[in-house]
UniProtKB/Swiss-Prot annotation:
Biased composition (Polar residues): 367-394
Source organism phylogeny: Eukaryota, Metazoa, Chordata, Craniata, Vertebrata
Cellular component terms (Gene Ontology): nucleus; transcription repressor complex
Pfam families named among the record's database cross-references: T-box
Protein name: T-box transcription factor TBX6
Annotated compartments: Nucleus
Superkingdom of the organism of origin: Eukaryota
Signal peptide stretch: none
Biased composition (Low complexity): 355-366
Entry's Gene Ontology BP terms: anterior/posterior pattern specification; embryonic pattern specification; mesoderm formation; muscle organ development; positive regulation of DNA-templated transcription; positive regulation of transcription by RNA polymerase II; positive regulation of Wnt signaling pathway; post-anal tail morphogenesis
Subcellular location, principal: nucleus
Length: 517
């Protein structure tokens, strides 16, 4: 109510009237939550999947408008165990036919009782559904669909070598439709060859998000196939629909095969189950043995063609695996043959990028290999690496002032230095050996040179001072002048180890008569 003098444009005021009395059939305020409040909107069996309403006449959304003439008219609500009638109007021409291609295979399983495995991740069907279509218009666009529906209202169990009903079926799950990947396609495409639905997967996961068909275990189901004339999958205007079923395709869903005859028949007829046959590799151990045999046999064939003059690295399988090529010739470019490498081995000469050819039956040895074969080093003792100075390392021209690389020592240490050979800070195992060599007629020296270290604060590594022989000015035959020369970080023997840590560039300048730096 408003004041008429202040709001004259609204006219005279009207008094408040009491509300109209409610109809006697209208529920009271306390019963508004009851289901009979809106009886005209109470639709049994409501579902909200309206993608293909023509395939399911019972699909009615709450408050939705009535179905259009292009789809099926609404029918009575279907309970459990009642087959849904196929789409009736509009129909495709009567000459449209569908045949089951692998009908004989389905009959073999149907005579025993077909069982289909369902898993949480989804399992494909075997036998697969393969059909052929005739009577379509060559230029018309068609969709091919498939769905699986229960045939009764019972749950089954395997008892006394047969399937028997064991109670009421589980509540019906939301039905899903499988659309053939070639849809839509012209009729000529569908009729030129059989159509396979082998990609259909069955699952018992009610929360599946992969689009698999959800089924209950221990229930009987029947696949259905539909031909729909439409321009695209989401078209709401269909020109016609025909549905087909084959009684041979009826099956029971299980999580594990119950009938032993079904198991044997699937092993015999399924090409992907050959591993379970009597002549197949059934066990995991047998399969692993077969894989190992395939890996070992090619290696044995390669070893037959391996030349004798080449050194092949062993195949490692531990944490110290080598990343170099298996056929790396690790003895190339060296004056001596190398022992078998271990985890700390580093080749002195960088490996060749081209592996040795295995086609040459008798490869010619290089000069370094000939020299290594002549040395015939058979043991890995400290004496093995004590080479003659004139044969192992090149001699340098005379240098004034004595040794090329004297260690920095004080005056007292210089007076106590012995020539031509002095060893300080060497392990005790080598000191006795070095003294015995120093007292013998001087032909042998450690690595062909003097070893000297200075002071208590000197680095642990020792400098090598090669012997000076003016009479010999050329390098020994077969020695590789490689700027990337590296000494191994160890001597592979049972005694103490000496580390010679010099770069290739420093040794190169040493051999050429230059300075240390």
């Amino acid at each position: 109510m408003y004041h008429s003098e202040l709001f004259q444009q609204y006219g005279t005021s009207y008094g408040m009237r009491p509300p109209h009395a409610l109809a006697p059939t209208y529920p009271t305020a306390g019963g508004h939550h009851e289901a009979y409040r809106y009886p005209e909107l109470d639709v049994p069996g409501q579902r909200f999947d309206g993608l293909f309403p023509a395939l399911d006449p019972s699909q009615r959304i709450l408050g939705a408008p009535p179905l259009t003439p292009l789809s099926l008219p609404p029918g009575p609500a279907l309970g459990f165990g009642q087959l849904q009638p196929p789409c009736e109007t509009p129909q495709l021409p009567g000459n449209v036919k569908m045949n089951l291609e692998n009908k004989e295979l389905w009959k073999q399983f149907h005579s025993i009782g077909t069982e289909m495995i369902i898993t949480k991740s989804g399992r494909r069907m075997f036998p697969q559904c393969k059909v052929s279509v005739t009577g379509l218009e060559p230029d018309g666009k068609y969709l091919l669909l498939a769905d699986i529906v229960p045939i009764d209202n019972s749950r089954y169990k395997w008892q006394e070598d047969r399937w028997e009903p064991s109670g009421r079926a589980e509540p019906r799950l939301p039905e899903r439709v499988y659309i053939h990947p070639d849809s839509p396609a012209p009729g000529s495409h569908w009729m030129k060859q059989p159509i396979s639905f082998h990609k259909i997967k069955l699952t018992n996961n009610t929360l599946d998000q992969m689009g698999h068909i959800i089924l209950h275990s221990m229930h009987k189901y029947q696949p259905r196939f539909h031909i729909v004339r439409a321009q695209d999958v989401f078209s709401r205007r269909w020109g016609g629909c025909s549905s087909f079923t084959f009684p041979e395709t009826l099956f029971l869903t299980v999580t594990a095969y119950q009938n032993e005859k079904i198991t044997q028949l699937k092993i015999q007829t399924n090409p992907f189950a050959k591993g379970f046959r009597e002549d197949g590799m059934k066990s995991k151990r047998d399969r692993s043995t077969r894989v190992k045999r395939k890996v070992i046999e090619p290696e044995e064939e390669e070893e037959e063609f391996q030349p004798e003059g080449e050194c092949k690295r062993p195949l490692y399988t531990g944490p110290c695996d080598s990343t170099l090529s298996e056929e790396l010739d690790i003895g190339r470019g060296l004056g001596i043959p190398l022992p078998s490498p271990d985890c700390s081995f580093h080749p002195i000469t960088p490996p060749s990028r081209t592996p040795p050819s295995t086609q040459t039956p008798n490869p010619s040895l290089t000069a370094n290999q000939e020299q290594g074969a002549a040395l015939e080093m058979s043991s890995q003792t400290p004496e093995t690496f004590l080479q003659a100075a004139g044969q192992s390392y090149p001699e340098q021209p005379p240098v004034r002032g004595g040794s090329l690389y004297p260690c920095p020592t004080d005056g007292h240490g210089a007076q106590n230095q012995r020539h031509p050979l002095s060893v300080q800070r060497l392990p005790q195992a080598f000191q006795g050996l070095q003294e015995s060599l120093g007292n013998s007629p001087g032909e042998y020296k450690i690595y062909g040179g003097d070893v000297g270290c200075g002071g208590d604060f000197a680095p642990p590594s020792c400098a090598v001072a090669p012997s000076v022989r003016p009479s010999e000015e050329r390098l020994p035959r077969g020695y590789s002048m490689n700027s990337e020369l590296r000494f191994p970080h160890f001597l592979p023997n049972g005694g103490s180890k000496i580390g010679l840590q010099f770069s290739g560039a420093q040794l190169q300048r040493l051999y050429n008569g230059g300075g240390w730096m």
